Each structure stands twice: as C-alpha cells, then as structure tokens.
C-alpha cells in the first residue's frame, strides 16, 4: 500500500507482485530441495510452512534495510498461493468485502488473513496437517505488523484508499 501511495498504481502493483513472488518462490525452492532429500527431520509440508514463516520474517525485517521492511501480506499471499491457489479464494472475497465497506487496506488485509485462518477448520488439507497452526501464526504476525494501522483506525487518522 505504501508503494502504491508513494509511487503510483503501476509501481505499486509491481512491488505487490514482486513481494508475492518472493513468498511463492521461497516455498517453490524449499519444495524442490526437500523433494531431493532422502533423510528429513520433519514432515515435508512442515518445511514449506517454516519457509513461509522465514520468508515472511525476512520480508518484514530485512537485514539490508536496518530491519525495516514491509508488512508481509503480499509475501504470505504468494506462499499460500503455492500451497494451494484455491485456498485464497475466500480470503480474497473477505478482503474485497471489507475494503469496499471501509476503504481501509490494512483492515481488509487483517480480515483476509483472519478468514484464511478460520477456513482451515473447514477444508481438508491432505498432507498439510499443520496448516491450522501456521495460518494462525501468520494471522498473528499480520496483526503485529499492522498494529500502526489498527491504532490509526481507532484514532480516526487512517488514510482511506
């Protein structure tokens, strides 16, 4: 959202897709490496979720920028698209619904990741047995990275898009 506001729509979308691809390819590379490994300490899907968590943390707190990065939503979105592209349908609908009502991107993002977490209780995940825990972790991280947005909304100073 910051790139969109500062640089305009074209550059903002470029940054958004770049961040989403970062999350997607982090899991893609992890999956490729794990598939070639004979001895594993964890279940293969756990490596994907650990890759998700670390790509999210690396995006939010990059060493190269004095640990000041983005809020991680697009990176997490890309990772969840890798896990299952259909898995983001309801969160996307939740995002659109909340955004159209309030015009707050931060609130819509928080809502989308809450929907993502809630839907893990209703969808069969096959090999992704820890999806509940990791989607909760990502939701809590999204809440943490959006805490300034939450404070601004409560104060009435959040900028609508």
Where are the regions a protein language model picked out?
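Nucleotide and nucleotide-moiety/phosphate-recognizing core
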Residues: 11-17, 21-63, 86, 95, ...
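Membrane-helix interface "capping/anchor" motifs
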Residues: 62-68, 97-111
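Interfacial segments of multi-pass membrane proteins
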Residues: 2-8, 30-34, 54, 72-102, ...
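C-terminal membrane-associated helical module and adjoining short loops/tails
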Residues: 129-161
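Membrane-embedded alpha-helical segments of multi-pass transporters/permeases
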Residues: 27-28, 64, 100, 117, ...
């Amino acid at each position: 959202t910051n790139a969109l506001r500062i640089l305009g729509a074209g550059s903002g979308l470029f940054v958004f897709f770049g961040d989403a691809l970062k999350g997607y390819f982090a899991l893609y590379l992890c999956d490729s490496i794990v598939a070639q490994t004979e001895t594993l300490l964890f279940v293969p899907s756990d490596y994907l979720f650990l890759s998700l968590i670390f790509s999210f943390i690396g995006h939010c707190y990059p060493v190269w920028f004095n640990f000041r990065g983005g809020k991680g939503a697009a990176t997490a979105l890309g990772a969840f698209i890798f896990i299952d592209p259909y898995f983001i349908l309801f969160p996307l609908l939740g995002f659109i619904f909340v955004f159209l009502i309030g015009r707050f991107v931060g609130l819509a993002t928080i809502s989308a990741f809450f929907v993502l977490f809630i839907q893990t209780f209703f969808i069969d995940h096959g090999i992704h047995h820890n999806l509940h825990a990791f989607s909760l972790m990502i939701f809590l991280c999204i809440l943490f990275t959006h805490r300034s947005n939450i404070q601004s909304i409560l104060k009435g100073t959040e900028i609508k898009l």
